[in-house]
């Protein structure tokens, strides 16, 4: 029996192991909707990996909203790929190699979360609202029973990785609009070559500085960002040149200040909040936001490289 058919007989909370510690999203808060309330019994998140999907398992990509610029559409789900390969081997070798159903279910659920994140990013790029009906029809399909869980995880991932939140403006029609987290007036999509929102990284850097006090040494910033697989001097598929983004772009946008530590020899540098950040938000709001979406007092971040949407044809 296909996994999609078998999964309809499972409960959302069954078979989901705690992965929030790895993702830093246990207890993450999605928009206060009936979907999130229904999913509250399952507070863990399933790890999602984006990259290239094996051709044999490539799903039909969600239809791009009208007016949306092209986003990369190919995705990769190693767990799903492994489950698929194991299933193929089982057909040849017999039931002894049948994959663990729990692992296969987790991987398939992760796939749906990733597909919904991708669909919502397309909607955000097009500056269009989104309805529950669109999400069900374009992405979720016969996984409708698991929609509360899928929606909650996708919403939390948008907040932490991309700095975007969904706000329900019509509870009856289940209509949602997008907003930048913390009410920031910047999302990182300014410019012709900006295909991914970067407010998530900005908020993380602001949180690191706030946690350190009034300023944070540059080496501390890169130490923290290394948890996201974001490194100084290494080109990133989402961020481009991270060093340039932090020391030039965010500085030019007046969200960060980058200065030499007085009296340092050899020269050392540090980051401070810029005037625009001080006007639009506060230390308390930023730290509260990070604690809320990471599910505890210790801020941890999912690897951004696992959320990369690589170049592909729309």
UniProtKB/Swiss-Prot annotation:
Bias (Basic and acidic residues) ranges: 1-20
| Reported tissue expression | Expressed in many tumors of several types, such as melanoma, head and neck squamous cell carcinoma, lung carcinoma and breast carcinoma, but not in normal tissues except for testes and placenta. Never expressed in kidney tumors, Leukemias and lymphomas.
The annotated subunit structure for this chain is:
Interacts with TRIM28.
Task: List where Polar residues composition bias occurs.
Answer: 65-87
Q: Is Transferase set as a keyword in this record?
A: no
Physiological role: Activator of ubiquitin ligase activity of RING-type zinc finger-containing E3 ubiquitin-protein ligases that acts as a repressor of autophagy. May enhance ubiquitin ligase activity of TRIM28 and stimulate p53/TP53 ubiquitination by TRIM28. Proposed to act through recruitment and/or stabilization of the Ubl-conjugating enzyme (E2) at the E3:substrate complex. May play a role in embryonal development and tumor transformation or aspects of tumor progression. In vitro promotes cell viability in melanoma cell lines. Antigen recognized on a melanoma by autologous cytolytic T-lymphocytes.
Official protein name in the record = Melanoma-associated antigen 3
- Protein encoded by which gene: MAGEA3
Can you tell which superkingdom this protein's organism belongs to?
Eukaryota
One Gene Ontology cellular component: endoplasmic reticulum
PANTHER family, alphabetized: MELANOMA-ASSOCIATED ANTIGEN 3-RELATED (PTHR11736:SF60), MELANOMA-ASSOCIATED ANTIGEN MAGE ANTIGEN (PTHR11736)
Matches recorded under InterPro entries: MAGE, MAGE_N, MAGE_WH1, MAGE_WH2, MHD_dom
Which biological processes are named by the entry's GO terms? negative regulation of autophagy; negative regulation of endoplasmic reticulum stress-induced intrinsic apoptotic signaling pathway; negative regulation of protein processing; negative regulation of transcription by RNA polymerase II
- Disulfide bond sites: none
Q: Region (Disordered): which ranges?
A: 1-99
Task: Tell me how the protein is altered or processed after translation.
Answer: Ubiquitinated by the DCX(DCAF12) complex specifically recognizes the diglutamate (Glu-Glu) at the C-terminus, leading to its degradation.
Please state every residue range assigned to the domain named MAGE: 109-308
């Amino acid at each position: 029996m296909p996994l999609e058919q078998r999964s309809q007989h499972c409960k959302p909370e069954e078979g989901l192991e705690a992965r929030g510690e790895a993702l830093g999203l246990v207890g993450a808060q999605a928009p206060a909707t009936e979907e999130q309330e229904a999913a509250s019994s399952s507070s863990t998140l399933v790890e999602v990996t984006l990259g290239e999907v094996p051709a044999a398992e490539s799903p039909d990509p969600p239809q791009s909203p009208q007016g949306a610029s092209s986003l990369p559409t190919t995705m990769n789900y190693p767990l799903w790929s492994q489950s698929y390969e194991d299933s193929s081997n089982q057909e040849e070798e017999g039931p002894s190699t049948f994959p663990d159903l729990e692992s296969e279910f987790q991987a398939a659920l992760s796939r749906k979360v990733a597909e919904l994140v991708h669909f919502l990013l397309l909607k955000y790029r097009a500056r269009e609202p989104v309805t529950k009906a669109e999400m069900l029809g374009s992405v979720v399909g016969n996984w409708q029973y698991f929609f509360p869980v899928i929606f909650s995880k996708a919403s939390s991932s948008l907040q932490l990785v991309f700095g975007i939140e969904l706000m329900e403006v019509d509870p009856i029609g289940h209509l949602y609009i997008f907003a930048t987290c913390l009410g920031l007036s910047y999302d990182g999509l300014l410019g012709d070559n900006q295909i991914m929102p970067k407010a998530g990284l900005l908020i993380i850097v602001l949180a690191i500085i706030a946690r350190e006090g009034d300023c944070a040494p540059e080496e501390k910033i890169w130490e923290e960002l290394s948890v996201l697989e974001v490194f100084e001097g290494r080109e990133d598929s989402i961020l481009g040149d991270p060093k340039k983004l932090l020391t030039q772009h965010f500085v030019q946008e007046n969200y960060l200040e980058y200065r030499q530590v007085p009296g340092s020899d050899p020269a050392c540098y540090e980051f401070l909040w810029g005037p625009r950040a001080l006007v639009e938000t506060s230390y308390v709001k930023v730290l509260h936001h990070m604690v809320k979406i990471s599910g505890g007092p210790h801020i941890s971040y999912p690897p951004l490289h696992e959320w990369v949407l690589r170049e592909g044809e729309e």
